[in-house]
């Protein structure tokens, strides 16, 4: 899967990994020949990555709602990042960054933004539908992956529409990146971490406002 240039590049990057990483595959076991082929390529890719660093290993296969897919995990950590498909093409950089960040390499963002991500409350399950030729998709994928590293309440799966065509068609997705949150259409187009966080804050503020409006009236409301 990796040519000599990519292998050399990735090996150099993996030297910056500080913590152990386990790549956990969820292989496809059905009758779709295309998915079976991509599942085999996924297994090959994971093995090639693990061979480049003693801090990276391939775990036992597990079931998942999307196959083929794989999770990038850190033992003892709740970090939840998954690629459903092969993150090559424009998404190879997303894969490299995810490996580094799950492996303990610092997320490169403004400290105020990092602190704000860490302060996000509640569980948030994001899914980004992307394609390997999409130029705007990596910005979204990388932002949500980094947020999932920074905050265990945030979970992210990047879905390659070319692999999971049935899911894309069922949702009527016509353009990528398409972002879903907790199963609902949440946004589309290029968004960086700050824009995603701003949108999350707006949703949280609206939810709190609606919750307050549904409560019984207060005799006295003390603010401060």
For the regions a protein language model found, what residue spans apply to each?
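N-terminal leader/targeting and pre-domain segments
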Residues: 1-19, 91-122, 205
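Local sequence-structure signature of Cys/Sec-based thiol-disulfide redox active-site neighborhoods
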Residues: 3-46, 117-158, 220
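N-terminal non-catalytic structural scaffold regions of very large proteins
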Residues: 37-90, 105-109, 113
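General detector of folded, globular domains
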Residues: 45-49, 69, 141-149, 153-158, ...
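Thiol-based oxidoreductase modules, predominantly thioredoxin-like and allied folds used
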Residues: 52-64, 152-166
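Non-catalytic, surface beta->alpha helical segment in thiol-disulfide oxidoreductase systems
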Residues: 72-106, 180-210
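Beta1/beta-strand and adjacent pyrophosphate-binding region of the FAD-binding site
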Residues: 211-224
């Amino acid at each position: 899967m990796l040519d000599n240039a990519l292998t050399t590049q990735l090996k150099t990057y993996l030297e910056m990994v500080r913590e152990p990483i386990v790549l956990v595959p969820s292989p496809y076991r059905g009758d779709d020949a295309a998915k079976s082929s991509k599942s085999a390529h996924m297994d090959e890719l994971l093995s090639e990555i693990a061979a480049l660093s003693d801090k990276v290993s391939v775990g036992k296969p597990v079931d998942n709602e999307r196959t083929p897919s794989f999770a990038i995990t850190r033992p003892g950590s709740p970090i939840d990042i998954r690629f459903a498909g092969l993150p090559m093409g424009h998404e190879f950089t997303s894969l490299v960054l995810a490996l580094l960040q799950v492996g303990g390499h610092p997320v490169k963002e403004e400290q105020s933004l990092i602190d704000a991500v860490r302060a996000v409350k509640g569980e948030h399950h994001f899914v980004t539908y992307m394609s390997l030729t999409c130029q705007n998709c990596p910005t979204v994928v990388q932002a949500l992956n980094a947020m999932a590293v920074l905050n265990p309440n945030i979970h992210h799966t990047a879905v390659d529409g070319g692999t999971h065509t049935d899911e894309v068609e069922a949702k009527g997705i016509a353009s990528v990146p398409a972002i879903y949150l907790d199963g609902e259409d949440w946004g589309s187009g290029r968004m960086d971490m700050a824009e995603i966080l701003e949108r999350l804050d707006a949703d949280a503020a609206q939810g709190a406002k609606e919750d307050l409006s549904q409560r019984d009236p207060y005799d006295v409301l003390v603010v401060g």
